[in-house]
């Protein structure tokens, strides 16, 4: 009779690159990005303030972002284990359900990059925040969204007035 040995389970840990950022707060020098994706702001007529400050906290399997924009502060809890964490964000007094994940990767220059995906679960919109880590004191944040503004406008134009043909140079 063969002995049945349980699989060894790995316990999630906080990656060393992120431990250096634990508890840090970052003031954004100049930002034109809001927590809510632009296309969602337009469809809900709820235009949020620009993000001014972000704090980061990490625990095994989770990333916590405290995002300040205008008068509101939102806590985003993102699963780093592949499982989204459910939560809510408040923008101009309106509450939106979100599910968030995060993962640590590297860019083409081998710098650590923390990607956070904030899915607005009642819509098709996703805010993507890429934190490119230069040092514990300095990082670049890139904001993206799905669907992209370009793709959303293309769909809108096709619904409203037919498909637009690209302009031909004269």
Stretches with model-predicted labels:
Residues 98:
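Residues that flank catalytic or metal-binding motifs in active/ligand-binding sites
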Residues 1-95, 106, 119-138, 142-158, ...:
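Catalytic loop of the DD-peptidase/beta-lactamase superfamily, centered on the K-T-G motif
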């Amino acid at each position: 009779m063969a002995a049945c040995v349980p699989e060894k389970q790995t316990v999630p840990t906080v990656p060393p690159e992120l431990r250096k950022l634990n508890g840090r707060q970052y003031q954004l020098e100049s930002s034109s990005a809001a927590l809510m994706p632009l296309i969602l702001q337009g469809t809900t007529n709820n235009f949020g303030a620009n993000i001014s400050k972000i704090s980061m906290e990490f625990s095994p399997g989770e990333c916590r972002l405290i995002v300040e924009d205008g008068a509101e502060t939102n806590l985003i809890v993102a699963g780093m284990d592949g499982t989204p964490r459910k939560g809510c964000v408040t923008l101009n007094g309106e509450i939106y359900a979100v599910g968030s994940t995060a993962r640590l990767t590297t860019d083409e220059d081998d710098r650590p990059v923390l990607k956070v995906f904030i899915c607005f679960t009642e819509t098709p919109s996703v805010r993507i925040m890429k934190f490119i880590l230069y040092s514990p004191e300095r990082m670049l944040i890139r904001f993206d969204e799905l669907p992209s503004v370009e793709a959303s406008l293309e769909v809108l134009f096709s619904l409203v007035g037919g498909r637009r043909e690209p302009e031909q140079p004269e």
